[in-house]
């Protein structure tokens, strides 16, 4: 199930029992902490929830003439099950954004395959992050909604 949050307060609050079993993405980082960090003004957080648990999430931020998809993560226990693909596809469909960009490391072949399957294509052989820094080891991809 897709959950769209325009503010960190829109995210479901964990119960006390869940606090002891928070998802970890990488050592020491809880999933809720990941979702709520860097919530920029006009940012959007999309979460895929399965059986009452967050299993994948992404953030979208206004960028250039569209949005920048960043922070796409799937909990390690749920990787390889198609949740991230479902999340990206559902978010693109639900939000009806004209253009969505994504920066992907050239070494991240699973993410490149996911983005390509969701209709993204490569437009630049570098990435310019929100802070203006340029990363030559990542490429920029774009999704252009054919219905807009």
Model region roles, listed by residue range:
Residues 5-9, 13-71, 75-77, 88:
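Acetyl-CoA-dependent GNAT
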Residues 64-66, 99, 140:
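A generic structural signal for beta-strand entry/edge sites
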Residues 128-148:
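C-terminal "cap" of GNAT-fold acetyltransferases
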